């Protein structure tokens, strides 16, 4: 029998709210990026606890396991960080239940998913490049700080070692890999 493994990212990521861009360059002007014919991405909502229950039923039915990339903190408009379990307590509890059932792996999807201070929608262009947390132009100490803090939040709440990192947008650098290794991550 073959095993099925699947992955979902952006759980708890404020990129859902703030990363907005158009399919066309002209579409990034003012409000146009929000219009359905031009919109390529964002905003979209967080899955709610009841929806996770439906996902769990499907996973059990097919003997599948889901890797869930959780962004450890939501970034508010003002740049304040709110840990995922505080911002979304019901959803966090649902994920903890799925972890306990052995059908989920919780993966680190970064602390913020974005470059703080540059995460808000722009009037005249896309903000897409600022919704990747581990660019090579981000200072080394930021990579280490973000991996450390996200590991602490996720491991404290889920009470299990977090050994997988899914970098937002699959963007990472050698600093990211060093930080991940230092804080116990085995798979990127």
Which functions belong to the PLM regions below?
Residues 1-163, 170-188:
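Catalytic alpha-helical scaffold of carbohydrate-active enzymes acting on polysaccharides/glycoconjugates
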């Amino acid at each position: 029998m073959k095993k099925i493994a699947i992955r979902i990212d952006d759980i708890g990521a404020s990129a859902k709210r703030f990363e907005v861009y158009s399919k066309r360059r002209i579409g990034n002007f003012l409000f146009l990026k929000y219009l359905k014919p031009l919109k390529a991405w964002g905003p979209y909502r967080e899955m709610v606890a009841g929806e996770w229950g439906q996902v769990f039923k499907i996973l059990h039915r097919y003997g599948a396991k889901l890797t869930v990339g959780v962004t450890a903190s939501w970034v508010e408009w003002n740049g304040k960080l709110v840990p995922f379990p505080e911002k979304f307590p019901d959803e966090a509890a649902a994920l903890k239940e799925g972890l306990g059932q052995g059908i989920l792996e919780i993966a680190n999807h970064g602390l913020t998913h974005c470059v703080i201070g540059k995460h808000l929608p722009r009037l005249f262009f896309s903000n897409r490049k600022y919704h990747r947390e581990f660019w090579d132009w981000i200072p080394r100490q930021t990579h280490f700080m973000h991996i450390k803090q996200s590991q602490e939040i996720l491991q404290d709440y889920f009470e299990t070692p977090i050994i997988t990192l899914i970098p937002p947008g699959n963007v990472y650098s050698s600093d990211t890999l060093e930080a991940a290794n230092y804080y116990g991550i085995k798979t990127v």
